[in-house]
Amino acid sequence: FSKEVTVNVVRPGKTGADEIKQMMTNFRNNPPKELGGSKVVLWKDFLKLEALHEDGSKTKLDMPATSNVLQWFCNDGTKVSVRPSGTEPKIKFYLEVKGDMKNASEYDALEAKGMEKVNAIKKGLRLD
């Protein structure tokens, strides 16, 4: 089971652009250690082309320079990607949560549990 939710945080005007820039700086300098109760084990910064591992080691991302994107990966498969929009006054969060589904009858329960996790992540990142 996998569920992805996009959260758009709109901050119009010059002050909004400054706020979005500051949010990215804060996330880059102080990345979350947990998301919705799950431990973050890998942090990727596609602007710096750098990955920070749970043990504190850093590795370079072997790819061409890309964009101002951060990704956080948890021990349970949860993933959060964050990036400012290039064309609109907003910052976008892509939240992905996972669960083991053995048969279709478990879907509704996993969907509800997935949304609980998404809401916990949003609360932890102060996106509500």
Spans of features found by a protein language model:
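Intrinsically disordered, low-complexity regulatory segments enriched in Ser/Thr/Pro
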Residues: R83-D108
